Amino acid sequence: MAIGFIGSSPDAELSSENSRISSSVLLGCLLCCTDWSAVVPGKTETFRKPFVAIMIKKLKSCFAAYLSDLEQGSMCDMANASPTSLELGLSKLDKES
């Protein structure tokens, strides 16, 4: 009796490895984004929505960079969304409301 495994072909193994790496990359990016929450503790829902939008945008760009085969060290460039720039953005929103 023959027993078959879905992951037995080299292509399936490669796909599984890419999927595992992609998940790790996204988890790493999510952890980077989660660190930003320490910068703005106790903010109201008014601030939470733009904060979440920034996190989602950075996750998408990080994942897109990974898919473009950039080096792992450069795929999570946080320069444009550092805690300082996030704080300034939230401060501006606070003044406008």
From Swiss-Prot:
Keywords: Cytokine, Disulfide bond, Signal. GO terms for molecular function: chemokine activity. The keyword Metal-binding does not apply. GO terms for cellular component: extracellular space. Disulfide bonds join 32-62, 33-76. Belongs to the intercrine beta (chemokine CC) family. Highly divergent. This is Putative CC-type chemokine U83. It comes from Human herpesvirus 6B (strain Z29) (HHV-6 variant B). The lineage of its organism: Viruses, Duplodnaviria, Heunggongvirae, Peploviricota, Herviviricetes. The gene is U83.
